[in-house]
Amino acid sequence: MLNPAGNMLKTPFMLAAFLLVQIPAQAHHSITGEFDTAVTFELRGTLTKLDWANPHLWYYLDVVNDAGVVEQWQCTTGQNPNRLIRAGWKKEDLPIGSVIRTLRSNPARDESNTCIVGGITFDDGTPVFSGNKGETTQ
């Protein structure tokens, strides 16, 4: 036999548990929380590493700054590899050692050498990835 009082206690508890799980999930996907979308810049660097893994694609660049010093940058497209694959993008499209440019990049709020990018081209301007929706321009 069902206990109506027991069910009444379970409902608020289940609702609270659901909401507590949702808060970190929303924070994880808050681009404006991690990146300063009011600041836009471009980087030019040599690809040193590519992390083609969920939840988001990350790639690493050696970038020569204005003082001639090499800085290591880590950048993300904000997309997961499965979505990029469905859009026709392949890991092989960005070979290690390639000189690439990031387009419409936004820096990390913590002032680390981290950014999210809106597009990637090779140094000669050949587009690789455009937009943050997993679109390929090849």
Regions inferred by a protein language model and the residue ranges of each:
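Short aromatic-glycine-enriched beta-strand elements
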Residues: 53-64
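Bacterial N-terminal signal peptides
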Residues: 11-22
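Short boundary/loop segments of OB/S1/cold-shock single-stranded nucleic-acid-binding domains
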Residues: 26-41
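N-terminal secretory signal peptides that target proteins for export/translocation
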Residues: 1-9
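Conserved hydrophobic positions within beta-strands
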Residues: 45-47
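Short nucleic-acid-contacting surface segments enriched for D/E, G, S/T with interspersed K/R
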Residues: 85-102
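Short, structured beta-strand/loop micro-motifs enriched in basic residues and often containing a Trp
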Residues: 26, 77-86
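OB-fold/S1-family single-stranded nucleic acid-binding modules
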Residues: 107-132
